[in-house]
Amino acid sequence: MSFDAQFYGVITGMFTKARFFKCALQVNPAGYIKYRGQQQTITEDEYNQNLLAASLEAGIEVIGLADHGSVDGVDKIRNLFVENGIVVFPGFEIASSEKIHFVCLFDENKTSQELERILGRLDLLAPEDGILPTNLTAIQLIDKVNDIGGFIFAAHCINDDGVLSRKMN
């Protein structure tokens, strides 16, 4: 049964119990390794195939695809995953002016060009670089992504520099 059919069944009451989907909402494309200052040792296609195999083995049904300030690789991964029954919510990771990292995900049908335009609306300090933060505070960024129709959440929030650790200290 396709995701759309399953979801339709959930909202129309065809199912008498809740239907849950196994999700991985912060999946990185092959180019993400560059953010860490490293070089990829396999091709993008090999990376995507390995990612797909790991996702299928884990029973993942939905992924959120996010790279730091970039949407490169979205289309290739989305096409491959959709062909294999996995829903892809494309997006990106971005840091607020306080350097809090957020994952921003959008409608599964958003094109990489539309995502690029959204990135352009988020006041990045250096749009061509994609790594530097936005001028927007966390609250402003959350509001703006919500206004655009996206879903935003704190990335790696339990790390030492994550938003939860900052809040508790």
Question: Each predicted region: which residue ranges?
Answer:
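Histidine-centered divalent metal-coordination motifs
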Residues: 26-32, 68-69, 156
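Extended charged low-complexity segments that act as oligomerization/scaffolding linkers
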Residues: 2, 48-53
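Extended substrate/RNA-proximal surfaces in nucleic-acid metabolism proteins
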Residues: 2-14, 20, 69, 75-169
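A generic structural signal for short
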Residues: 39-40, 65-66, 129-130
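Short, glycine/acidic-rich beta->alpha junctions
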Residues: 44-47, 69, 73
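Acidic/histidine-rich helix-loop elements
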Residues: 29-45
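Divalent metal-dependent hydrolysis catalytic cores, especially in the metallo-beta-lactamase
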Residues: 51-68, 151-153
